[in-house]
Regions:
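FIC/Doc superfamily catalytic core
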Residues: 1-312
Length: 312
């Protein structure tokens, strides 16, 4: 495939995803799915850690989840950094401060680092890659953004974790390059699928461009299919609940599990504005309907899982 054909295919996939996203009724569910999916992909692509989604959901509740390893506890930090990335810089925020915040968020689990030295290294890292980042922010064409991602990836900035930082910034940069402001599309999963080929392509600017466009197309297509799946899963979960067991808070509770498939009783009560007793009544109905399953914890704050919400 030629570079022109690859770029056209990427634009087409992004346009289809953008159009579907505009009509997707629950953008917060889509955003939550993307953040979880991209976190798992970044953990695999940059950290070499094949993390289960259930473990990630537990870590999002408790970042010291007892059944997790030290390396897995990086996942909530990656998750927060991705959310910071797709939100973009605030209107009055210096983009370089925004980039530093993303990097700092991703390193939050490193509790033993020298904070002062780390801050100096972050500033030095940003200055080292200042030119390609400024180019990508001021002239966000697909070609310029692709080269920016490549230079961050192969550079020695960010304590040698340029690959991670490139993947964290990619969703926002892709969004601007392909002029799809509502789209959430990353690169990590597509690039991790054939790591050897990716490592070969990233060292050469021309080879990388074609590889980058193909990864964008694959990622946009996967996100499109995932949103379709999420819509079906939501309808299927609602259908499991008989009308006589349905309440005005059943729907919001199901949506809560679609945003994070593992929830605690206190999370549910707080999110739907209910008392602990009222939340337990809804939880019992969802358990009887087969929507959720109890996990661990005390009766007062037990965890519950909706396995179907992980289907996408």
């Amino acid at each position: 495939m030629t570079e022109a054909h690859a770029l056209a295919a990427a634009f087409a996939a992004m346009a289809r995803l953008d159009e579907y996203t505009r009509h997707f009724r629950n953008p917060e569910i889509a955003r939550a799915w993307f953040a979880r999916s991209e976190t798992l992909a970044v953990m695999q692509a940059s950290e070499g850690e094949l993390l289960q989604e259930a473990t990630l959901c537990h870590l999002l509740i408790d970042d010291l989840y007892e059944l997790s390893t030290l390396k897995q506890r990086l996942a909530p930090c990656i998750h927060s950094a991705i959310l910071r990335s797709i939100a973009g810089p605030a209107s009055d925020e210096d983009p370089l401060d925004w980039i530093a915040a993303i990097w700092g968020e991703s390193e939050r689990s490193n509790r033993h680092r020298d904070v002062g030295a780390a801050q100096w290294r972050h500033e030095a890292s940003i200055n080292e890659i200042l030119a390609p980042i400024r180019s990508a922010l001021t002239t966000p064409t697909p070609e310029v953004v692709a080269e920016c991602v490549r230079q961050i990836w192969v550079g020695r900035a960010f304590d040698g974790r340029g690959k991670r930082m490139a993947l964290l910034l990619a969703p926002f940069l892709i969004q601007r390059a392909f002029k799809a402001p509502l789209v959430q599309c990353g690169l990590a999963r597509a690039l991790a699928r054939d790591a050897d080929r990716t490592n070969e392509a990233v060292v050469d600017a021309e080879s990388w461009l074609l590889h980058f466009y193909a990864a964008v197309e694959e990622s946009a297509s996967r996100s499109y299919e995932a949103l379709n799946t999420l819509a079906r899963v939501k309808a299927d979960l609602a259908a499991l609940l008989p009308r006589e067991r349905e309440t005005s808070r059943s729907g919001p509770t199901i949506e809560l599990f679609l945003q994070r498939p593992i929830q605690t009783a206190q999370d549910i009560a707080g999110a739907i504005g209910s008392s602990d007793f009222g939340a337990r009544l809804i939880i019992d109905k969802l358990i009887k309907a087969g929507v959720i399953t109890p996990l661990d914890g005390s009766r007062q704050n037990r965890s519950y899982i909706c396995r179907k919400a992980m289907a996408a």
